[in-house]
Amino acid sequence: RRPIWSLIILLAAAVVLWLIFAPWPPGLEEVLGRKRIFLNAIFGGVTLGALYFLVASGFTLIFGLMRNVNLAHGSLYLLGGYLGFEISEFTGSWLLAFPIVFVIVALLGIVLQHQVFRRMDGEDLRQTMVTIGISVVLADLMLWYWGGQSYTIFAPDWLSGPATIPVISSIRDTGEIVYLRYPAVRIALMFAALGIGVGMLLLLNTTRLGMFVRAGVDD
């Protein structure tokens, strides 16, 4: 069964790659719609997956190493987003907000570890219930302070606007090839997720710290 499913997955991946990179023959757009819309949907899904990976990577690493069921993880990310907005508005630099927010949220995580998780080591149900409560309290406090409206941290000039990706989106009647244009900030998000994923892989498999982490997971 496994070779059959592997072959099916390989063929499906080949078809998707062909649909993305190859010029579509006449008549295919009548079946699937415009290729530009198809490509935007594909890249939008990849971008969303990259964002989910950034959020989930920390949760899985913490749970895998320390067996902490931290369901307040998402609220901590949300708090980091709000703090990043406030700091970038105050300082005028979105780049400065990154290390400051990192330190603040990391300190909050250390406090949770020492004051909450250490007292409930190995008690998954209690950790689940307590962290759900912490998540609800944090979410309500943020809703009270920042309200329900959305906030935007504007991208720097070098990430604003669309960027051209070497993927053919259409071919005009004159034979001119039109390449896909996609928001540069979303491309940066995909590369950031890829970089973090590769960095975590190398950290866990090629360094002494990674050896300690893997040993902690196994034992």
Give the residues covered by each predicted segment.
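Small-residue-rich transmembrane alpha-helical segments that form helix-helix packing/gating elements
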Residues: 1-66, 71-216
